[in-house]
């Protein structure tokens, strides 16, 4: 199974004396393949293209997501690559104010709050089949000091996530 998806955002902003075209396009695909009756391989890739400049003067392509993993019995999954940080599990349930605010979720590649590189993620649904509705996630990100800018560096990172999605049959 392979899904192709995309988005085009035509945007222009006028703030504090600035006048900027912020148009972009996103293109991605996600896929999965059945390896055997219990094991499924999956992956996703998504890129963003700057469409706000004249041809030949764009700032380039940004890789937003690029990861691959294995899912065992739809209860346990493990993946590695550029993916959402484990702290984004909170942001996925709330309004992170993507245009005006939500600054704590905007620092990509640090703090495991947004898209980030080099993360190994283990997730289980129904706590390995023991408790219906209880999910657990654990994530590790290796140190990255390859950029000379210290605001783009980070040490080893760990994060954990716990969720329960059926409080009193509410679906929450």
Predicted regions and their residues:
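Conserved adenosyl
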Residues: 157
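Outer membrane beta-barrel
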Residues: 1-142, 154, 163-166
């Amino acid at each position: 199974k392979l899904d192709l998806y995309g988005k085009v955002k035509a945007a222009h902003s006028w703030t504090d004396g600035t006048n900027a075209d912020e148009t972009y396009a996103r293109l991605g695909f996600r896929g999965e393949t059945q390896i055997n009756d219990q094991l499924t391989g999956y992956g996703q890739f998504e890129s963003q293209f700057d469409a706000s400049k004249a041809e030949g003067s764009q700032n380039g392509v940004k890789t937003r997501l690029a990861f691959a993993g294995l899912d065992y019995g739809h209860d346990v999954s493990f993946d590695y690559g550029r993916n959402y940080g484990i702290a984004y599990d909170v942001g996925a349930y709330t309004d992170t104010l993507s245009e005006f605010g939500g600054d704590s979720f905007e620092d990509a590649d640090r703090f495991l709050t947004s898209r980030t590189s080099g993360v190994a993620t283990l997730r289980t649904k129904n706590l390995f089949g023991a408790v219906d509705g209880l999910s657990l996630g654990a994530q590790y990100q290796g140190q990255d000091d390859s950029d000379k800018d210290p605001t783009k560096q980070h040490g080893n990172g760990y994060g954990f996530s716990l969720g329960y999605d059926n409080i009193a049959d509410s679906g929450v």
